[in-house]
Amino acid sequence: MQLMEYTQLALFLGLLALMSPVLGRFIGRAVLRGEQTWMHSVLGPVERLIYRASGIRPEARQSWRQYAASLCAFSAAGFLMTFGVLMLQDKLPLNPQGFPGLSWHLAFNTAVSFLTNTNWQSYAGESTVSHFSQMVGLAYHNFVSAAAGLAVAVAVMRGLASQESKTIGNFWADLVRSVLYVLLPISLVLAVVLVGQGVVQTMSAGTEVATLEGGRQFIAMGPTASQVAIKMLGTNGGGFFNANAAHPLENPTALSNLLQMLAIFIIPSSLVFTLGGAVSNRRHAWTVWFVMACLFMVGACSLYRAETLGTPLLTEVAQAPVTNMEGKEVRFGIFGSAMFATVTTDASCGAVNAMHDSLTPLGGLVTLVNMQMGEVIFGGVGSGLYGMVLFILLTVFLAGLMVGRTPDYLGKRIEGREVTLAMLALIIAATPPLLFSAVAAVSGWGQAALNNAGAHGFSEILYAYTSGVQNNGSAFAGLNANSPAWNVTIALAMLIGRFGIMLPMLGVAGSMASRKARPIGEFSFPVSGFTFGLLLTLVIVIVGALTYLPALALGPVVEHFQMLDGLLH
């Protein structure tokens, strides 16, 4: 890496470290505790109007089971609405292109995808989905799916901070506050800034232009900036255009690229400090944040190194070192593309400014491992925080076993119930990618979708199901996944990955809330400092990533050795 690359990395992490504690404190006041903020003079009446119109009593507290039931009911209603909009879009307004309704399996996959904050897209947005579907069906879920994740994270924090309580908050109040005070204001500001950078925002279908070759070309357009802002901020990732953030009308400049990367990480990063404030332990928050930052830097530097080395076959033909610029935009270069790929797979975002299918085998391996570690390297909005809490509980439990102490976290004993729920969440998350990948690899419908045979074809299958279950949404685009079998199985993976972790973590929150915290003494395992950070990192890598090692050995690892032998370029 050169000085310019080091400077860009330091600038990105520096801005993130400066902004995150500030936003984290604000989220703690506005969402976690429901206190008055400077926004309440404007948005407070709107919040109260929503409560009155929908019959919500924000002061009513819910047990973890009631909280989970509200979450599931809200998600089911959102799915039905979006499924109907997509199926009937030819009969709905704001469809200047005259797009027909989606097939049942594509509508099912897409509705589940946006409901679960995955935004996996088996279609090209600008040629398949109307403006109405984009704004009402999809952009709506960009807000509420992120808000649901944020609400669950806040509920988990309450569970850790409360003592001898049977409740963990009110899902409906947490949802409304997350949208009104966090997602909506930041998205509005970011959308305006992106328009200033050249991202389009129009209700027209597009325009026809004369090309340099003398021909005519239709340029698709639409309400892009408003959707890009929330798709990044909410770690959704689904692009208005098929090329996603590589499209010049969606991500035109280096500054827009930096802003979009910051938008992806800012809320997950801030929630770490919200947790620190909730449990009155800011050193713990900084330790967890540095673990996330270190894992991010290792991934970004590894991916950058893999792409700058290129491939031996092309180097031999060129008689000079050739970097891997395939699938990348010149305006971003290798470092800007490697950074974005690392950010988007560390968070459960899935937006791309370069084609991940064109990465070198080791570059693709980095993106896969980022997701397979559980999307806890900052992670998605809310999901990154409660996923990290899962690994923290396991770390403290294992540390207690090693030294013969009763494991406790923040003064509360960790018992069999919490460990069982945590391991259940890990097993639920690991099973669908391995099981569905095995089935697809030997099935006719699975093999028919591949444009690449051998190790890379298997990597495409493994990436698709890993992306689905980790609610990421990015893809190795050589896979033709728009078929009934693919759409249904990936949708099932997305549902399992979303609720198979959310619900056990709500159970953990309810269990921890009922406990009384003991004073933290000299025999308590410290949850800050180098030792804890190192143990947490090892648990994330060993328990998270090594689960998939045999599958990775059959995909990107084999492909890397084939590349070194000159069998691949």
UniProtKB/Swiss-Prot annotation:
It comes from the Bacteria. It is a multi-pass membrane protein. Belongs to the KdpA family. The keyword Cell inner membrane applies. GO terms for molecular function: P-type potassium transmembrane transporter activity; potassium ion binding. InterPro entries: KdpA (IPR004623). Part of the high-affinity ATP-driven potassium transport (or Kdp) system, which catalyzes the hydrolysis of ATP coupled with the electrogenic transport of potassium into the cytoplasm. This subunit binds the periplasmic potassium ions and delivers the ions to the membrane domain of KdpB through an intramembrane tunnel. The gene is kdpA. Keywords: Cell inner membrane, Cell membrane, Ion transport, Membrane, Potassium, Potassium transport, Transmembrane, Transmembrane helix, Transport. Its main location: membrane. One of its GO terms (cellular component) is plasma membrane. This is Potassium-transporting ATPase potassium-binding subunit. The chain crosses the membrane at residues 3-23, 68-88, 136-156, 179-199, 259-279, 284-304, 384-404, 422-442, 490-510, 534-554. NCBIfam families: kdpA. It is found in: Cell inner membrane. The system is composed of three essential subunits: KdpA, KdpB and KdpC. It comes from Nitratidesulfovibrio vulgaris (strain ATCC 29579 / DSM 644 / CCUG 34227 / NCIMB 8303 / VKM B-1760 / Hildenborough) (Desulfovibrio vulgaris).
